[in-house]
Amino acid sequence: MKRYTLLRTFMLFMPVLIHCGWVSAHAQSAMLKGVKALGQTVYFEPDTTSVLKNPLTGWVMYLGRAWDENFWQTHHYDAMPVNGGDSTVRVSDYAGTCYIRINWNMLESKEGDYVWNDPDSRIYKLLASVRERGMRLAFRSNVDSRDQGQNTPLYVKEAGAKGFQDPNNPQIWSPYPDDAVFQQKYEKFLQAFAVAFDDPDKVDFIDAYGLGKWGEAHGVKYNNYSNKVEVFEWITDTYAKAFKRVPLVINYHRLVGDTISWAEPHPDSKRLLERAIAKGYTIRHDAFGMTGYYEQWEKDFARAYRFRLPIIMEGGWITGAHHRYWIDPSGKYRQGHSEDVRWGEYEESRNAHVNMMDLRIGDEVASWFNSSFDLVKRFEREGGYRLYPTEVSFVNKARSGERVSVQHNWRNLGWGYCPTNIPQWKGKYKVCIALMDANHNIVKKQLADEADLSTWVQGRDGHYTTTVNLDGLQKGNYTWLIGLVDTTKACQPGLKMAVDKNLLFEGWCKVGKLKINN
């Protein structure tokens, strides 16, 4: 009776306390709802140097048809000189993704004989070497053979597909993408490809067009040009039906699907790209830093999808080969100075708020590390998405069965965003509050469903209050944890946070202590 009287007296005086400002807004809400108010706040400083290797963010290195088992050593990828050669690093210590430019013929030269199933094949060993170095895969499969080798397996031609010879090499054949036999065979291949590689643990993205010159979605040669839109719908439908879990990307080229490679933007291009995006595609571009090719149309298209889709960057100039990059209209690139191009690519990537940048291969990757290593580290620090909790408020004493509040604020240090809004991810990454017992067992998890990671962009932090029910917990000492979990994997940590490594436990960030009394 005495306890009831005291509680009744306190509730009678609550309006007075609130009116006088003696109770915080959060405490007011907590007391009125039966949730225990906060007791302690911890502030976090971000880790701005560690390479996190989260999905769909960070550096991408390239591999292609020239790979062999000695590649990592002979091309110095396992010991790449930096800063003029005063030390070396592994390229894979900075690249989280390895993008493999490959062709259909290399993957299935004989119908139904898929090279990724053959442990003795060069491609199988290539893929294994990438995974051994802690990188995810990405793919573009080319079918057009012009300027390259035989990219489509000849069994397609033998089955009756119509096509054309490379004018510069009549021994090389390519199929018309509007040919029914080609489409039937390619659909079968892509379905098998997806069975093996529609796995986000192994694959970061699929460059899901692959038609035209170099697979870049321009210079497409049809049997009948009137089939252009029909072919675009067919290829994007085929990829979207095959790949459900791995993000698909397409080059936002001003002449996407057209027969020419450069001109004023085609009136169809924006509409076609929007059709692909509606099917779940995200976007990339293959000419960053080429200011005569990456112009206002491209900038406007990227701006329209800023923080709505992740943007993947590829530089356009090949600085160590035949490209005369010093004639770029910007006038900023000096002959013999690859580092000028690297800076131009970096600036344009920052302006576009890209999530991923390319190291590519050859002189590109060598110059990124040798003369522009500061930019490699800078992008890790300020590009893509880089998430961490700025502060967490929690109770440090409670009773079993009580409901307590945890207040948590989040920040993205990167100029990009965490694309939990794309259909392949379906919001699978969430904030989670957890409790760990004295034996390091996770005994309680509570998702912060209201927290949308895709809304955390520079200048717009996330602020949330999550209620945790302590029902079922025994008397004892516990540790508050917070993390970014993968809800498709029993809410285990799925994204790495930019916090001090000393605060981490199996991907969770340790926040503070909680003592539970019965």
Predicted regions, residues:
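Bacterial Sec-dependent N-terminal signal peptides
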Residues: 1-29
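Catalytic-core regions of glycoside hydrolase
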Residues: 32-82, 94, 131, 207-215, ...
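Extracellular/luminal regions of secreted and cell-surface proteins that mediate adhesion/ECM remodeling
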Residues: 380-518
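Active-site groove signature of glycoside hydrolases
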Residues: 163-225
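Catalytic cores of secreted or luminal carbohydrate-active enzymes
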Residues: 341-394
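Conserved, mostly hydrophobic/aromatic
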Residues: 98, 193, 206, 239, ...
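Aromatic-lined substrate-binding rim segments of carbohydrate-active enzymes
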Residues: 84-166, 226-247
